[in-house]
From Swiss-Prot:
Lineage, broadest ranks: Bacteria, Pseudomonadati, Pseudomonadota, Betaproteobacteria, Burkholderiales
Native source species: Paracidovorax citrulli (strain AAC00-1) (Acidovorax citrulli)
One GO BP: translation
Pfam family, one: Ribosomal_L19
This protein's encoding gene: rplS
InterPro entries: Ribosomal_bL19, Ribosomal_bL19_CS, Ribosomal_bL19_sf, Translation_prot_SH3-like_sf
Name of the protein described by the UniProt record: Large ribosomal subunit protein bL19
Length: 128
């Protein structure tokens, strides 16, 4: 590992953020710290992850939602101090890494099938 990668790993460890495992197709709720004047509040942004970029400290992901009939996409830096928390609401079953095709779809064709836990995981959960 070179020096830059080592420094990035140390910085990620120092930030001490708990980021859940999520993938494209998952529905997530991103809590964002918003500063308005002298007030600071937390705003929830819920949508489908359409892209994920894994670059160590520079990692990011794009979340798409439909707001009052209009598609809205927002790109977040994974380790940004503006992100208060990330919560995975629903797992999506997709076969692509980038779901940009959802931009051209609306209604039922834009739905993503839910990924159900496999039978092996269910057996392990009941045994424990």
């Amino acid at each position: 590992m070179n020096l830059i990668q080592t420094l990035e790993q140390e910085e990620i460890a120092r930030l001490n953020k708990t980021i859940p495992e999520f993938a494209p197709g998952d529905t997530v709720i991103v809590s964002v710290n918003v500063v308005e004047g002298n007030r600071k509040r937390v705003q929830a942004y819920e949508g489908v992850v359409i892209a994920k970029r894994n670059r160590g400290l520079n990692s990011g992901f794009t979340v798409r939602k439909i707001s009052s009939g209009e598609g809205v996409e927002r790109t977040f830096q994974t380790y940004s101090p503006l992100i208060a928390s990330i919560e995975v609401k629903r797992r999506g079953d997709v076969r692509r890494a980038k779901l940009y095709y959802l931009r051209d779809r609306s209604g039922k064709s834009a739905r993503i099938k839910e990924k159900l836990p496999s039978r092996v995981n269910k057996a392990a959960a009941t045994a424990a």
